[in-house]
Amino acid sequence: MTRVLLIEDNTDAREALRALLELDGYEVHAAADGTEGLDLARTKAPEVALVDIGLPGFDGYEVARRMKALPAPPPLMVALTGYSEPEDRQRTKDAGFTAHLVKPVDPDDLSRLLAHLGTPGPGSRG
């Protein structure tokens, strides 16, 4: 079962994405901020990390930088953001994110992306 780390400070968005991912067959570990997310990255070794860019404390770009510095191989990182301009997409790419999803995230787009990344869940709709 593919392990997904979800770092999202908005409780409703986090729980909705968690439910969607679990329905698709993923093992989900969720965090409300970057510190908690990095702790989970160290202990759960996720294959994929969905990271909100606008986190409290340190933002998603800093999470990506710190995640890449962990001893274990970093997960595939997907940026979750309300910013959709080309320069925003370029910034997430430059920060090491594999993909950029604009919130609110479309469930089918997320399923297709995870399948494209080679991490389809057993019940994936994509």
Give, region by region, the residue ranges found by the protein language model:
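Conserved phosphotransfer cores of two-component systems
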Residues: R42-K44, R66-P75, A95
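Acidic catalytic/metal-coordinating carboxylates
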Residues: D33-E36, D59-R65
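Acidic, metal-coordinating helix/loop segments flanking the phosphotransfer/catalytic sites
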Residues: A30-V48
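C-terminal output helix
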Residues: V105-L114
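Active-site residues of response regulator receiver
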Residues: D52, T81
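Two-component/phosphorelay signaling modules centered on CheY-like receiver
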Residues: T11-H29
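The feature encodes the CheY-like receiver
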Residues: P56, E85
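Conserved acidic carboxylate
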Residues: E8
